[in-house]
A protein has these predicted regions:
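Short, compositionally biased
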Residues: 178-189
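Alpha-helix C-terminal capping segments
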Residues: 79-87, 242-243
C-alpha cells in the first residue's frame, strides 16, 4: 500500500509545488526567508493534516487529548523554521470549525503550552476563528516567524561531498502520512484487539519539537553545520532536495 492507493499523489504535489515556485520567488525549502537588514526573518506555515481525523475518531480513548494537537501544530511550524538557524519570534493560527465548542479552547491551550517551552517563549499573538457549518470537522493551521543573523543563516548551499549526516530520534510519525497510516492500521486486526487503545495513543503522540535542541547545537557547532532538514512529508526526499542534484546519500 502506498500514497497513491489512498488518493494522495506525491508526484502531483511535486508538479504543483514546481508551479508555485514560479509564482513565489521567495519560496525556498521548508520555510521562506526575507532580508530585513542585519537579519533574516524566516517564516513558515503548516497544518497537522488528517491526524485531526484520527483524533476525532478516537477522542474517547483514555489519554487522548486535543491539547496534544496544539503541540503538533507548533512542532510542524517551528521545526521547519529552525532548520534555517532561526530563533522563534511569534506565531498566528487559523482555526476553521463547524460550530463553536469549548473543546477548541483546549486546543489553543496546547499551542500556548508548547510555545512556552520554546527558547524565547514566542507568543501566539493573533489568529482567526472561522465558523463553517457546512464542514464536518475542524481544521487548524499555524504561521510562525523566526529570526537569525545573516552570518548564522543555514540554507544548505554549503553542503559538500564528505559531509556527515546525523539524525535525531523522532517521537513517532509527527503529523505527516496519517491518511496512509489510518488506512493501513484501520485494516489491521490489531485495531480491534485489546491493544487498540495503546496503538491509538501512540499514533496520537504529540510531535517532538526539536527547536531547543537544534539551537543549542548551533551555538556550539554552527560553523560545522551546513544544512538542517525536518523529515516530515516526503521523508528522505527532503534531504535530497536540500543537497541538490550533484550529491547523493550514502550509508
Amino acid at each position: 500500500m502506498d500514497y497513491d492507493s489512498v488518493g494522495v499523489s506525491l508526484q502531483d504535489q511535486d508538479f504543483f509545488n514546481a508551479k508555485l515556485a514560479a509564482k513565489m520567488p521567495w519560496l525556498g525549502g521548508q520555510a521562506g526567508a526575507v532580508d530585513v537588514g542585519g537579519d533574516y526573518l524566516v517564516s513558515g506555515c503548516d497544518g497537522i493534516g488528517t491526524k485531526i481525523k484520527l483524533y476525532l475518531e478516537n477522542k474517547d480513548v483514555k489519554g487522548v487529548s486535543i491539547k496534544n494537537l496544539g503541540q503538533d501544530l507548533v512542532a510542524m511550524v517551528f521545526n521547519d523554521i529552525v532548520c534555517f538557524g532561526a530563533t522563534p519570534l511569534f506565531m498566528n493560527d487559523y482555526l476553521a470549525v463547524p460550530s463553536i465548542d469549548d473543546e477548541y479552547l483546549e486546543l489553543i491551550d496546547g499551542i500556548n503550552d508548547a510555545l512556552k517551552e520554546l527558547e524565547g517563549k514566542p507568543p501566539l499573538i493573533s489568529g482567526e476563528t472561522a465558523i463553517h457549518p457546512d464542514i464536518e470537522t475542524f481544521d487548524i493551521a499555524g504561521f510562525g516567524v523566526g529570526a537569525c543573523p545573516k552570518a548564522n543563516y543555514i540554507d544548505g548551499k554549503n553542503i559538500k561531498e564528505g559531509d556527515v549526516i546525523l539524525g535525531l530520534r523522532s517521537s513517532g510519525f509527527h503529523s505527516n502520512g496519517y491518511t496512509l497510516i489510518r488506512k493501513v492500521w484501520l485494516e489491521k486486526e490489531a485495531l480491534r484487539s485489546k491493544d487498540r487503545d495503546e496503538i491509538i495513543k501512540r499514533l496520537l503522540t504529540p510531535s517532538r519539537i526539536y527547536v531547543n535542541t537544534i539551537l543549542a547545537v548551533l551555538r556550539k557547532y554552527a560553523p560545522s553545520i551546513n544544512g538542517i532538514c525536518h523529515i516530515t512529508g516526503g521523508g528522505r526526499e527532503n534531504l535530497n532536495r536540500l543537497m541538490g542534484e550533484n550529491l547523493n546519500l550514502r550509508p
